[in-house]
Amino acid sequence: MENKKFFTGENIKISLHFHNRSLFLYSNVNFLSNFIDAKGNLNESVTLLPFKKLDIQLNFKVPSRGIYNAENYLLEIHDLFLISSRKINFNNKFTFTVYPRNIRLPLEIQKLIDNVSNFSKNNPNTHTSDTYSYIDKYMEGDNFKNIHWKLSAKKNNLYVKKFDTIKKCNIAIYVDMTNILSLPGTFPTVTDEGLVSFSLSIIKYLLWKNEAIYLYIENLKSSSFQLENTEDYYSILSYYLEHKSLGHGNFFDKVLKKEFQTIENHKFIFIITYTILPMHAKTISKISADCENLIIFTLLDVPNKTKNLLRNTNVKVVKVTL
């Protein structure tokens, strides 16, 4: 193979080298595989001459991300008169990875994220630790509630418990992978590949801006991640390589309701989904009331009724064009 790193929809080339060591002539050679569809077969008839070598280049595209083990592939070879045929298995095995397509975020989306990032840096989300880190003598301005009475009585002086201020993650991203399989057949081009590629682009953009992220992915089975640096990006990439959309789920009215307490801990919420319906407006409005900014990215147009229901909230809905 010419390259070990490929992306969905990208042209992949495999070079095949044959040596016919027999006296027979073989015509109409076809390449069969468990990872290449009919369009990926050899485009024209190939003939293997007796005692001759032949180099063939196979061009194909893989429409879906994943790790492909190319161990089940073979040649179907017909005789000269096309009366009989036989299949020859390849002994050599190879594995290649097809990654989600890289998407450059549109300028207007970059500006949205930049505004959130700048506000986040200027307004850190902090809380006081539940346990004190050390004890010090009381000074004017210290909280009287934090006095360590037992130690103060023993030392005959006032001592206070000191608590660390902990910086909390400001930004949370919720990714809905559940509804793609329930979309009508009128949207054949809308797949989870687009959703995954877009979510990875936003995650990467934020991490490269040194933003910590709480990431929640719903795919019938929930998965959550704390992302703090660029190395964490690759753990999410690995997750997406191993997981596809599994089926329909009630993301807004069941999944997000369970997350209300966690959502309240973050000032900025991004939701990435396929679309939002009027029946989701109540849940979305409740989420928006507990955060500074709620941005929902959709792959499909949102009904006007939904937009009207969210008009007087701080919710921004962005239709993504991939």
Residue ranges of each PLM-predicted region?
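Short, surface-exposed amphipathic charged segments that create phosphate/polyanion-binding patches used
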Residues: 111-113, 231, 310-313
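Short, glycine/charged-enriched secondary-structure capping and boundary segments
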Residues: 187-189, 230, 284-287
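General structural signal for secondary-structure boundaries
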Residues: 63, 140-143, 190, 229-232, ...
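An amphipathic, basic-hydrophobic helix/alpha-beta surface used to engage anionic
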Residues: 1-224, 268, 272
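Disordered, low-complexity tails and leader-like regions
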Residues: 139, 154, 182-184, 220, ...
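Von Willebrand factor type A / integrin I
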Residues: 15, 242-322
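Short, conserved, surface-exposed binding loops centered on an aromatic residue
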Residues: 163-165, 205-207, 228-231, 259-263
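Short beta-strand-loop
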Residues: 217-243
